Amino acid sequence: MMTSVGTNRARGNWEQPQNQNQTQHKQRPQATAEQIRLAQMISDHNDADFEEKVKQLIDITGKNQDECVIALHDCNGDVNRAINVLLEGNPDTHSWEMVGKKKGVSGQKDGGQTESNEEGKENRDRDRDYSRRRGGPPRRGRGASRGREFRGQENGLDGTKSGGPSGRGTDRGRRGRGRGRGSSGRRGGRFSAQGMGTFNPADYAEPANTDDNYGNSSGNTWNNTGHFEPDDGTRLDFIGVEGSNYPRKFETAPGAWRTATEEWGTEDWNEDLSETKIFTASNVSSVPLPAENVTITAGQRIDLAVLLGKTPSSMENDSSNLDPSQAPSLAQPLVFSNSKQNAISQPASGSTFSHHSMVSMLGKGFGDVGEAKGGSTTGSQFLEQFKTAQALAQLAAQHSQSGSTTTSSWDMGSTTQSPSLVQYDLKSANDSTVHSPFTKRQAFTPSSTMMEVFLQEKPPAVATSTAAPPPPSSPLPSKSTSAPQMSPGSSDNQSSSPQPAQQKLKQQKKKTSLTSKIPALAVEMPGSADISGLNLQFGALQFGSEPVLSDYESTPTTSASSSQAPSSLYTSTASESSSTVSSNQSQESGYQSGPIQSTTYTSQNNAQGPLYEQRSTQTRRYPSSISSSPQKDLTQAKNGFSSVQATQLQTTQSVEGATGSAVKSESPSTSSIPSLNETVPAASLLTTANQHSSSLSGLSHTEEIPNTTTTQHSSALSTQQNTLSSSTSSGRTSTSTLLHTSVESEANLHSSSSTFSTTSSTVSAPPPVVSVSSSLNSGSSLGLSLGSNSTVTASTRSSVATTSGKAPPNLPPGVPPLLPNPYIMAPGLLHAYPPQVYGYDDLQMLQTRFPLDYYSIPFPTPTTPLTGRDGSLASNPYSGDLTKFGRGDASSPAPATTLAQPQQNQTQTHHTTQQTFLNPALPPGYSYTSLPYYTGVPGLPSTFQYGPAVFPVAPTSSKQHGVNVSVNASATPFQQPSGYGSHGYNTGVSVTSSNTGVPDISGSVYSKTQQSFEKQGFHSGTPAASFNLPSALGSGGPINPATAAAYPPAPFMHILTPHQQPHSQILHHHLQQDGQTGSGQRSQTSSIPQKPQTNKSAYNSYSWGAN
């Protein structure tokens, strides 16, 4: 879904540049055009057509007339485009807004378009142009919105090549990352499925930061890219379009990484991962042997020399030992992680893992450097660096540097940690051996050396030996600490070296990756284990991981297998830039089984996390979390709280994850890291990667479980963490979409972080964790966790509610929950909700909610309450009350609060027994209001019979007040405004006041999101209309007449109800459907009346995030 969505958006944005161009062209003679338009506007001859179009637009899109008119106007009367604009999110609006800025760039943009026609040559030219344009100035340009936008547009052009997604990404606010986008676009060209939009969240999340911070800090790789972009860019240009892209691509890669949440991002990442693989090649440099790796090898060598200048010899030696066989594999997986992951994984896993170690170190470096420099670069840089550098650095640096050294380091981490890892590992007894498999997974770094050793089944010795060598290379290898130390240098070196390597790799990538362009992620994801490994994001990688786990399970076979599998995980990780974190996570997933979350999370966090984790599991982890938290925070500026929360949450999670006590202690940091990562991705991307780490994705989740098996806690933790991660991941996708939205979505998921919190709480207990995971997943709509979803729901239901509400917003995850949630909420939550809401007669209230009530109410109502009502309500007595109430309502909404009760009281007074029900129902009067809505749907008669009793009051007040939701029972409508705030919220239940309570929320928060809802006046206006009830009730004083009268309104109301159902519980749910924002609020409101206030705040940010 995400892919399609991304593509559509991309196309939409892709069109935007064209639209913008058109707009620009139009604007050039704008004065005349404006005059013409003014004339047209003044003249009436076009009005018929225009109005017809507007009406058409309104019917099709359901937008406001103003919006439709504006969109139509912007689209110059092009209804189709206007529809797209309205539904796609007004890409044109931005274009128009940007037109002024873009004009300067328009020439370039046009050139870009022209170039886009000549994709290959022009791409290179454009890349060179980008290098020049963006090289030195491009950085400024990047920083400058104009440059970015131009890049974005060009990217959009590229997007055309790339299939449009990049264009979309570029056009979006993510233009900030324009340069990266450009490369992304080109990459997109290489990979039709770029997921440009996917990493957009990250891009926009960290546009400028990425540029400067990127260049300066952890941007090591990025730094080179950015700083050296002119040179590198040129060099890259020589390499080819890819080369030029590379610097940007790094940027893009970060974006793509962020997109990790989306599957599209993975594609970009794969490219980036290829770059990463270049790094890997660097590692392989010792193993430059494979011709296929030649490019990579060269790149790797460069990376090794540059990145691992100090360690390359030892690293290379180790790598040579491991890599000789792995190098080709590694190179291949690295180059084309997606397709070759598994096969190549085996050898590659060593190298790859080395990279991973390196990445971890780099990640750690990023964490350290990122933290230090990350302050500024944290968010985008970290995300990017973590993802890109992580993937690249991981693969390249880890593979090359860490390959031997870091690998050793990792190995040390895993080997040295193997005792503790043993704690982590399910198979403590087999500590070395088991750990070795885990080390393979966990210490993928040693994997290159160690992995092969594992293959050789000398993992303990190798691990130890590897560990030993790394210490010599202590800068990198020395545990995570050294790794971090090294990583700064390494990362820097890597960054500079990687670009060339990546450039070369990129060419290769074009050769190799081109084949897997789109399939690599989107298509291949479901593909073979290798590909699945590549598709770390959604568990495909995990599939590779699963074998790894199995392999891990049996050390002997496992060694080779696990080498592959980890490689697969790792490589796939590396392969998927999105998997960068993912890959880390993927590894870490694999790791997870081994180092458990420490690796897993570390990987997730940053490679650094894993390094820390693995080296100094906890300590590093914490640094990782620190590093990652900056990342996350920056990345999650939106999710900032999330990242913090994630930390707590994840910490708990880590505990949960940490099956072993030692692991647990690490785990917290580890967990926190993943959480941060998730939060960081909040960013769907990071989250995805992060989640990935867990499972690299919700799906990974399952995969992770296998890992989990290996990693006992991992199974619970991995699974749960993965689940959490995956949940977040799913939720993010892209969330978000990564989408931000993914990011915001992520943030929301991270809001869900509560869920994570719950998770963390439950995390302690792996089962709860599972539940939590499930809940997150459910929020993420991870089918995987769905099973536990229930559990999670139970444990984290509130969070889940948020999540679920959010997940639907994160539609990218393809969460059907949106509809299900509304329905679930309507049936399930309503059931629970009404009881919650109605402490009164739950049965009656519920019944009122349900058809039975409609029927039963008519029976009961007529029987007891109805009679009483008929006497008083339908009859003059109630009408009299109504009048009083109406006056009371009219007098003050505050009294209205009382009014509802007074109504009840008076009604009760008049109809004590019967009114008792009615009255309790009445507080549910809101409920009744909703009932009229709700019942209006199925049992309007009953509702109205019931309602008339209420409505007669409502009619008076309602009519008096102009149908403030006349059905609300006069009091309610008024309560809505003022009374409701106190009353509705006071009555957590009154939230029911689906009408009032929700309308309140919707009015304030929701209305923003859902203007229609707002305009609906909280359904007060529409309900009033739909409720011709007041009049129906009023006119039909007797219940029967009222009912009869109500019937017509009821159908009408019913019709409205579907649309406005948010008012009633259905309305709530419906609004959720209608407005994702609403969904969050509504679903939580209805599902969690208790949380209305919290949800309310959460909704504001959360719902918005979701939207």
From Swiss-Prot:
UniProt feature, compositional bias: Polar residues: 590-656, 689-713, 1088-1107
Q: Which Gene3D superfamilies match?
A: DNA helicase RuvA subunit, C-terminal domain
Phenotype on disruption: Ubap2l knockout results in a lethal phenotype in a majority of embryos. Mice with heterozygous Ubap2l deletion have cognitive impairment and behavioral abnormalities, including lower preference for social novelty, mild repetitive behavior, anxious-like behavior, and abnormal spatial working memory compared to wild-type mice. Stress granule intensity and numbers are reduced in developing brains of Ubap2l-deficient mice compared to controls, and neocortex development and lamination is abnormal.
Which superkingdom heads the taxonomic lineage of this protein's source? Eukaryota
| Modification N-acetylmethionine occurs at | M1
Signal peptide as annotated in the record: none
Assigned keywords, A-Z: Acetylation, Chromosome, Cytoplasm, Methylation, Nucleus, Phosphoprotein
Residues with the modification Phosphothreonine, per the entry, are T445
Q: Which GO terms describe its cellular component?
A: chromosome; cytoplasmic stress granule; PcG protein complex
Q: Which residues form the UBA domain?
A: 49-89
Identify residues that carry Phosphoserine: S376, S380, S436, S474, S487, S490, S491, S497, S624, S625, S628, S629, S872, S879
Q: Residues annotated as region Disordered?
A: 1-33, 92-229, 461-513, 550-676, 689-814, 885-921, 1060-1107
Question: Where is there biased composition of kind Basic residues?
Answer: 133-145
Keyword Iron-sulfur listed: no
The protein's location, in the record's own words, is: Nucleus; Chromosome; Cytoplasm; Cytoplasm, Stress granule
Which InterPro entries is this protein grouped with? Answer: TC-DDR_regulator, UBA, UBA-like_sf, UBAP2/Lig
Q: Name the residue ranges with Basic and acidic residues bias.
A: 118-132
The modified positions for Asymmetric dimethylarginine read R187, R190
Q: Where is the composition biased (Low complexity)?
A: 213-226, 494-505, 554-589, 665-675, 714-804, 893-916, 1073-1087
* Chief localisation class: nucleus
Supply one GO BP term: stress granule assembly
State the protein's purpose: Recruits the ubiquitination machinery to RNA polymerase II for polyubiquitination, removal and degradation, when the transcription-coupled nucleotide excision repair (TC-NER) machinery fails to resolve DNA damage. Plays an important role in the activity of long-term repopulating hematopoietic stem cells (LT-HSCs). Is a regulator of stress granule assembly, required for their efficient formation. Required for proper brain development and neocortex lamination.
On assembly, the entry states: Interacts with BMI1. Part of a complex consisting of UBAP2L, BMI1 and RNF2. Interacts with G3BP1 (via NTF2 domain); promoting stress granule formation.
Q: Would you tell me the protein name for this molecule? A: Ubiquitin-associated protein 2-like
Q: Which organism is it from?
A: Mus musculus (Mouse)
